[in-house]
């Protein structure tokens, strides 16, 4: 048995990372320490005045582990890795795990292209971003392609020059046709360098060039060309207006501010590139309002910059953060150049930080209003559920199940969880049928519930660390009527459980209409909050099942399609799908884009391109 007080005496006087676990062996907190002995002992001192969240965490700790490292920076990096791996309950977690989009100009190619990417590499290309929205990137790229008549096809230049006829875009004067020699390599590259200067914020140069061309065309009485150039100037001005200059030094910065109400914390990030705000992002941390802001910001920065691929030279903060020197060293190592963390005291930066903080406050207010509306629906819906079904109390954990299949193939099930009336996405589970070989909703539902509940039994008996099925439902909802409910009840009772089970029945138009419970069917009126609540659960369960089914079908299609290509094995297939997301995108990619994928050489890229083209 783990004796916490005895183990505290054994802690070393060194830097490292500590891992707190509960009675089930689940990791509930990960932290780092300059001196492990001092930091970990602080948690268990009765005189310590810990915030409520820390007190709750300590009350759950049954054992701890630690890992010794050589430096604070190593400890910080390991802490970030373990938080990402375990997603501990009591750590501040970023729910958004996306990679931000960038605009990439492939100056490393003879005929550069402009494209969207989510990977920044040292490959000789120029990258601009990050942008907070893929739509913003697509709009900018589309505008630039129209303004500069760039090629949009996947022809490999200079290899394909003169091999095919010019496309429709050329005849519509929307492409310079480098594939036909309509513009030579040096001219095309110079134009792409202009685009890079444009993306870097140097709009005036391009506008002046276009204005000179417009005036020349007008003097030569070529009014059609002059009008086209005038329209281009207008488009560039409109695009530049969306990225106002804030700083004349044209530095890259991230501005981080925050706002908190009585319960929640909102952190907002403004991305400043070349002196212009190109985007922003916000993060809501529920229940974190009372945390020390230095700790909260420090934790956020470590997680946020673990995920992003580009780190600016300066990070401007609303207030001081814990471990600022260590974080700056880590970010400097990550970027390869010096990164500074700065809390401004005067000047324009103070005004901008205040603006970011105000935006965080507005975002938090809107979040609270939306929560209030949703909470009303959920709380009223839950109250009606309790009354309608005659339950003793509101179910704290609802598990909802649905089946999805394409004929007799790719039969899958989803398990969606709502805790205290709200979706708990980290608790969602997906199942691929093992014993069902043809369409059979009842059999599929029974297999799903058997595997889910049997796994829970096994985890409890074996004391599984980081158990994923140990939490049990207060109410099970199945997509269907009385037959589905009976099929589910049979499995539940066979395994020795006595959960409440209800069916979510739909009408002929596939809309939620009633609940089936204990042999009775309860119609749900259209104005009932309960109908909106059950519909939300049913739609979410259906969405997860359908998306999983689609993903498996895509994998099967990939196997049959990509297996025909020489040099493509399992590892390369996975890498291609991870990068492009679909076979359709792979089919459209050119050789250079294919080579961006890990493990895809020029030879393999040519094999793929030639197979599809």
Swiss-Prot record:
InterPro entries: GIY-YIG_endonuc, GIY-YIG_endonuc_sf, GIY-YIG_UvrC_Cho, Hlx-hairpin-Hlx_DNA-bd_motif, RuvA_2-like, UVR_dom, UVR_dom_sf, UvrABC_protein_C. The UvrABC repair system catalyzes the recognition and processing of DNA lesions. UvrC both incises the 5' and 3' sides of the lesion. The N-terminal half is responsible for the 3' incision and the C-terminal half is responsible for the 5' incision. One of its GO terms (molecular function) is excinuclease ABC activity. The keyword DNA repair applies. Residues 13-92 form the GIY-YIG domain. Keywords: Cytoplasm, DNA damage, DNA excision, DNA repair, Excision nuclease, SOS response. Residues 204-239 form the UVR domain. GO terms for biological process: nucleotide-excision repair; SOS response. It is found in: Cytoplasm. Interacts with UvrB in an incision complex. This is UvrABC system protein C. It comes from Ruminiclostridium cellulolyticum (strain ATCC 35319 / DSM 5812 / JCM 6584 / H10) (Clostridium cellulolyticum).
């Amino acid at each position: 048995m783990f004796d916490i007080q005895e183990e505290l005496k054994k802690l070393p006087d060194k830097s490292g990372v500590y891992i707190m676990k509960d009675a089930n062996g689940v990791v509930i907190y990960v932290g780092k320490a300059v001196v492990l002995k001092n930091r970990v002992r602080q948690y268990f001192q009765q005189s310590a005045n810990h915030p409520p969240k820390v007190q709750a965490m300590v009350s759950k700790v049954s054992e701890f582990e630690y890992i010794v490292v050589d430096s604070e920076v190593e400890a910080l990096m390991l802490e970030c890795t373990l938080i990402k791996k375990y997603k501990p309950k009591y750590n501040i977690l970023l729910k958004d795990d996306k990679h931000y989009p960038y605009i990439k100009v492939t100056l490393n190619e003879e005929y550069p292209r402009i494209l969207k990417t989510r990977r920044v590499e040292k490959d000789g290309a120029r990258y601009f971003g990050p942008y907070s929205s893929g739509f913003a990137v697509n709009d900018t790229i589309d505008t630039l392609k129209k303004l500069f008549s760039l090629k949009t096809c996947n022809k490999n230049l200079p290899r394909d020059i003169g091999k095919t006829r010019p496309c429709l875009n050329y005849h519509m004067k929307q492409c310079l046709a480098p594939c036909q020699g309509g513009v030579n390599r040096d001219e095309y590259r110079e134009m792409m360098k202009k685009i890079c200067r444009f993306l870097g914020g140097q709009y005036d140069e391009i506008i002046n060039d276009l204005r000179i061309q417009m005036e020349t065309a007008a003097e030569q009485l070529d009014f059609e060309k002059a009008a086209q150039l005038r329209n281009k100037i207008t488009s560039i001005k409109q695009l530049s207006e969306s990225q106002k200059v804030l700083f004349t030094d044209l530095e890259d910065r991230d501005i981080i501010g925050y706002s908190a109400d009585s319960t929640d914390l909102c952190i907002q990030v403004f991305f400043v590139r070349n002196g212009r705000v190109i985007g922003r992002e916000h993060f809501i941390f529920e229940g974190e309002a009372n945390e020390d802001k230095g700790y909260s910001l420090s934790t956020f920065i470590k997680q946020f910059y673990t995920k992003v691929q580009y780190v600016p030279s300066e990070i401007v903060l609303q207030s001081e953060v814990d471990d600022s020197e260590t974080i700056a060293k880590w970010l400097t190592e990550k970027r390869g150049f010096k990164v500074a963390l700065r809390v401004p005291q005067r000047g324009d930066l103070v005004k901008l930080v205040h603006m970011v903080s105000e935006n965080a406050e507005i975002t938090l207010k809107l979040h609270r209003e939306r929560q209030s509306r949703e909470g009303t629906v959920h709380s009223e819906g839950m109250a009606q559920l309790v009354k309608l079904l005659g339950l003793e109390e509101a179910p704290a954990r609802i598990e909802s199940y649905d089946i999805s299949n394409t004929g007799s193939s790719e039969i899958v099930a989803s398990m969606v969880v709502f805790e205290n009336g709200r979706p708990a996405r980290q608790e969602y589970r997906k199942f691929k049928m093992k014993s069902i070989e043809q369409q059979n909703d009842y059999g599929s539902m029974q297999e799903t519930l058997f595997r889910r509940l049997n796994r829970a039994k096994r985890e409890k008996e074996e004391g599984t660390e980081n158990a994923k099925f140990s939490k049990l439902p207060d109410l099970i909802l199945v997509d269907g009527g009385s037959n589905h409910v009976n099929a589910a009840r049979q499995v539940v009772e066979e395994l020795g459980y006595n959960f409440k089970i209800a069916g979510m029945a739909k009408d002929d138009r596939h809309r939620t209409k009633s609940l089936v419970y204990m042999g009775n069917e309860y119609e749900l009126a259209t104005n009932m909050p309960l109908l909106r609540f059950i519909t939300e659960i049913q739609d979410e369960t259906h969405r997860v099942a359908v998306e999983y089914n689609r993903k498996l079908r895509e994998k099967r299609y990939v196997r049959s399609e990509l297996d025909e290509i020489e040099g493509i094995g399992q590892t390369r297939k996975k890498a291609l799908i991870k990068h492009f997301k679909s076979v359709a995108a792979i089919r459209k990619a050119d050789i250079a884009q294919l080579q961006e994928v890990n493990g895809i050489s020029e030879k393999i890229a040519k094999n793929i391109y030639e197979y599809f083209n």
